[in-house]
């Protein structure tokens, strides 16, 4: 026996369950096993049989199956109440049966006198909905009917009182009744919290019912956002129909070209009927027939899916139109910030959730609370999975290198690989409700989960082998039909560039929705193209110029000859079967491509300034780029992220071949790190569920707690802090990028405060590093808007509503789109903003700027802020300190930006710091106080030395 016990400790069990069985069992028991999930979120099912107000909803469901009690029921209830003690304790132990009726029904029934102690009620703070939800539910229900009193049942009639007389009275009444015996008690009113007959309900009430019965906010908000991106119901339907038609055309036209045309007869034929194959579909090969039927069934399935989605689109249309007040014409121009504002208004007007929910469903509502629905919460719900993928790319957890000897150091990330990552990782980690499986948050199943993830990678690799040929053919035909005519008309477009899929995930920030990210990246394209063209490519330029000269000369001679005698010369064959028209097209295309490779002669060479403009929009500034923006190594690294479109397409096609090898060899090596990542970078937020820790911004503490490993000295770096921090200041950029999009009030900012987008000029402006030698002209700013020059624009991209925190001057809360617990602190906002701004400055030495603003941790012996704020130009100094060259006035003193008079507040603070209080000296009023205030205004506002009184 001892030997068997010892062996059982070391040998694995024979019938051990698989990791998927453990995941399913853990999902079923997650409410009882996850302590963090139950803490403050779930209800206590067994609290001594005491009654809670939440059972009002259960009673409403029970009332749906029965009628209201009659007066006889009240009498029977009184009789049964006296018989309860004799029936034993077994029938009194069921809490649900005992309290299946709501309190107002219990109080209305005479004889039911249940004793409730003061200590038996559960506080509202411990409940999910709270008592206000029950009150709101009862206010929406019709009032209960008043029970009949005993004297209202039958009016008492005069008659004899003896027993014999009573017997004769009953016999006479039976022969000739005083009341109509056929009269029945009217049926009681039934309450039903289930789905009403929505076909006959007013559309606004239907939309309100749909909103009140939302049980999964993640899916609902995704539909809201998809409807916003699709620009309304008709645009979405048109997009889906055109997508189906495009797919059918590509498949049908490709089948026609490959199976229905006899290309051997093309040369000697004059009409199309001569080269067509009769009944070509019957002569197709077996593989072509199978593929055609497979694509046909796929198209039919997509068509049915489109038809079934019309109902959801109609519901979303009613939600936007009746509850949010956004019509289909306005949705194409309204901003997402305004939609969020109206969602918050709807939340405040209708805080209650679904009416009748089960106990298990009520526990699930712990992660679906409608009270957690401001801009930050909505972004976290919409990007619950995307935030994890952004963090995986940022921290280099994914091994995307090609397992090929000569391409081992080259990462490959395509749209196909992204689909596989979502299938293998995200669908494995998240459950059907969109929450992280609690089994991944424990280290007890780390090995089993890692092995399961490794098997998913290998299985997906084999699936890609069977699917890749069909996808390759479809994408090649679709790309050819779409872009060939464009390249034919404008051959220079072949050299056009765009960001790679990997670059987009590197540039995207936490909680940044797709349309905001796309807008920011699209504004960087002119600057990125200008930066790539900045670098000297003298050899390439010389060769391209020579090719352009030769091809242009030949094309011009042929064009001139065809103009002189077009009828004779256009049919002239220069080579065998090659006429003048053919060579005109060839030479013209070669000339256009070569001419596109030659830069403009008037361009000014300044790659550092051009790259700074790109960084201002992409927010991507690796630590190895510092001090090397002018180098060719940085250009090569950026060129890998900003490639030609034709190269990206070829990589997309080749990735369908190389993706199985990445899934077989590269990604399984990082399966352990992936499991550890989800366990160590997942936090639980009340009412939201499990989120990526980097996506939960600490607005109260600001960014002072955010670790920036690249800013510390190498000798003092903490490895643990670096492990739990993002690379290249990603979280810091995400924090202020989020504030830039949502930090200002949508309706509070004046249109003049919006930052305007300007395309790159042909020469560096005065704000560029190369213009700093001209003096302090780069320090000048626009006083009305306090807007910096183009060379030092806002660090975190274009602001839709102007500078953060400057829109609402009447309140310290910078945004109406954030709840009070998400309002950023003023001190953290100011300090971290200066620190973040310095990351994107030029590495060139700049002339010293008088009156630099000092951070909180600088030496107290430095000049004070009052003196530094009064620079020669009269504008606030740049937030980067004295090391920032050529930076115009920006948002300094951001902690006071909501106030109306910044100068007066600063002076009051300085006077209080000096030990003198003007109000105390002047007595709070009088001539002396006014004179002192006027003296300070003359000294500070006009820069003069006031004459003492």
Curated annotation (Swiss-Prot):
Lumenal face of the membrane: 254-289, 564-578
Compositionally skewed regions (Basic and acidic residues) per UniProt: 35-57, 75-85, 129-139
Catalysed reactions, as listed in the record: a 1,2-diacyl-sn-glycero-3-phosphocholine(in) = a 1,2-diacyl-sn-glycero-3-phosphocholine(out); a 1,2-diacyl-sn-glycero-3-phospho-L-serine(in) = a 1,2-diacyl-sn-glycero-3-phospho-L-serine(out); a 1,2-diacyl-sn-glycero-3-phosphoethanolamine(in) = a 1,2-diacyl-sn-glycero-3-phosphoethanolamine(out); a 1,2-diacyl-sn-glycero-3-phospho-(1D-myo-inositol-3-phosphate)(in) = a 1,2-diacyl-sn-glycero-3-phospho-(1D-myo-inositol-3-phosphate)(out)
Cellular component aspect of the GO annotation: autophagosome; cytoplasmic vesicle membrane; endoplasmic reticulum membrane; Golgi membrane; mitochondrion; phagophore; phagophore assembly site membrane
Keywords assigned by UniProt, alphabetized: Autophagy, Cytoplasmic vesicle, Endoplasmic reticulum, Golgi apparatus, Lipid transport, Membrane, Phosphoprotein, Transmembrane, Transmembrane helix, Transport
Region (Disordered): 1-197, 748-919
Membrane side Cytoplasmic: residue ranges: 1-232, 311-431, 478-542, 600-645, 667-949
Membrane-embedded but not crossing: residue ranges: 432-477, 646-666
GO biological process terms on file: mitophagy; piecemeal microautophagy of the nucleus; protein localization to phagophore assembly site; reticulophagy
Alphabetized InterPro entries for the sequence: Autophagy-rel_prot_9
PTM notes: Phosphorylated by atg1. Atg1 phosphorylation is required for preautophagosome elongation.
Transmembrane regions listed in the UniProt entry: 233-253, 290-310, 543-563, 579-599
Subcellular localization, as worded in the UniProt entry: Preautophagosomal structure membrane; Cytoplasmic vesicle membrane; Golgi apparatus membrane; Endoplasmic reticulum membrane
GO MF terms, alphabetically ordered: phospholipid scramblase activity
Primary residence: membrane
Record note on domains: Forms a homotrimer with a solvated central pore, which is connected laterally to the cytosol through the cavity within each protomer. Acts as a lipid scramblase that uses its central pore to function: the central pore opens laterally to accommodate lipid headgroups, thereby enabling lipid flipping and redistribution of lipids added to the outer leaflet of atg9-containing vesicles, thereby enabling growth into autophagosomes.
Family: Belongs to the ATG9 family.
Subunit organization: Homotrimer; forms a homotrimer with a central pore that forms a path between the two membrane leaflets.
Protein name: Autophagy-related protein 9
Species classification: Eukaryota, Fungi, Dikarya, Ascomycota, Pezizomycotina
